[in-house]
Structure formats: C-alpha cells, structure tokens
Amino acid sequence: MTPPLAAPAFLASAGWGGADILPVAGDASFRRYFRVVDGGRSAILMDAPPPHEDPRPFLAVARWLTRNGFAAPAILHEDLAQGLVLLEDFGDVRLRETVDAEPARELGLYGVAVDLLVQLHDAEAGVDAPYDLAVYQREAALFVEWYCPAVGLEVDTAAYRDAWDAVLAPLLAGHRPVTVLRDYHAENLMLIDGGEGLGLLDFQDALAGHPAYDLVSLLQDARRDVPEATELAMRDRYRAATGAGEAFDMAYHVLGAQRNAKILGIFTRLWKRDGKPRYPALCPRVWRYLERDLAHPALKPVADWFAANVPPEKRGDPMQVAA
C-alpha cells in the first residue's frame, strides 16, 4: 500500500519530516491508514481522500468525545482539502485479539466496554443528525439490494419495507437520543492505559439514536463469535447500570435484526462491487445472530417476510449459496 503523494509534505508541515510511513490494515471503506515512525515516537496518518471520504465528521466527533472525557485519538495535524489527518497512535492491542488470546479476560474487558457505553449514553448526544426511520430503512434495504440478487432471489421489496416499518416505528417513538458510534465492536476498541482503558476508533458515522444500537454492535459482533453467555451477562450489566426495562430487550433484538440485515447487504456489496472477497465468509455468523433476533415476538412481521422470501438454503455465505 503506497502512501499518498502529498504525505511527505503534509508530515513535514506537522513536524514529522523524514519519518518512516508504514501501512496499517484498513477497514471496509476508502480510508487508508499508515503508521508514521520517527525515532521513538509514532503517530497514525489517516488518508481519507475526497470525494470518496470526508474527514470532517471524524474530527468533529473526536473532539466531542475528548471534551466529554472519552479516549478518542488526539488530532495532531490536518489538511481537509487533501483528506489527510495525523492522529495519536493508540498502538496495536485491540480488544479482539486480547480476548481471543486470553479468554479469561473476556468478561472483564467486555464489562469495561459496556460501562463506557453507559457513560456515553448518560451524556447529551454529541451529534445532531438523527438515526431515524429513514436511515434505518435505507440501511435495511441493503439486504434486498445486494444479498438477495447475489444469491439468485427475487423478493417482495415492498413487503420488506412494510415489515420494517411495522417493527421500527413503535421502537423509535419516545426514547432519548444518545450518541450512537455505529461500529462499536472488538476490532475498533483499543486497549490503552496499561490495558485498563479502551480507546475509540471508527466513529465518523455517529448519529443521535437509540441506546441499544451500540450494545448490539458490541455483542452481536459480525467479525467475532461472542459467547451467548457473555452477551446475556453484558446486557444484564447494561440494564442494571441504566435501569432499562423489558422494552430495552425488545429494542435490542429489533435493532439487532436491522443491523444484521444491513451487514449482510454490506458484506455482499464489498464482495460484488468493491472486489473484497473476504467478507462473504463472515455472513454465516451474521445469519445466526439475525435468526436469533427474528425469534423475538416483536420481530414477527420481519420474521414472516424472511420465512416467505429467503429459504434456509439461501442463508449463509453468499459466495457458496449462490450456486
């Protein structure tokens, strides 16, 4: 992965001239990341090239998080016109690899992640754009736009939308909006402060929405098997800390189903449109989460649609079940 041509001049203007620029594994977007090393110090260079990417939402949310006591990377230098940002380096120790290597730490570290959400949700929302019904519907539609055609299914898209309207509209009435980071999972949580704290990444798409969403993102992780016992214990921990009642469990499953349907569409799009074939293999896990969520009585309209439109043999890795 070659650094952007403007990187050396940008780094020189930030006081990092002559530093080594090393690639860092990226995400599912057009953004790219590089570690900048200069002697004993390091930083992260974000390349968010326009017009595909805009670093301003990331910068705004990062500054809000920092002002409110959360660990977002410090912004060291920026050039918005070129989409370049120099950030504090949180290192390489992610929650994902830590708990995979040390299962005994899973409950404790997931507890830290849940407690962070409790604190985040106690604050007033730090973004204005709402996570409303239109956004939820647009996201859920990715399933019928990408997954279904990829596996050879012709489905009733109008009934799909109606089913989501039926389950989402009651949920979205009457809750206090909180900051929803939207990709709050084990690969975006960095161990900092000697492994006692968590640093936040990949929050540029934050919206003001339902508090259950990021808990779903953490506990129904598309990239990692979270044991069901851990999921239940962490939901109980969140409810105990916030006083959330039975309605929260309903919201958890509704938003879990919506998120997982969206992810199935996104992972298929990453394969079909963006040429990233590693994502379909993650879909069987996402299907397991989705089917578990659909079993909740509040999801009956959506569950009925899936039963009528997506047969069991078409639920899995789209590269495999398309044949």
Model-flagged regions — what are they?
Residues 1-84, 178, 192-199, 307-323:
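Conserved NTP-binding catalytic cores of kinases and kinase-like/nucleotidyltransferase enzymes
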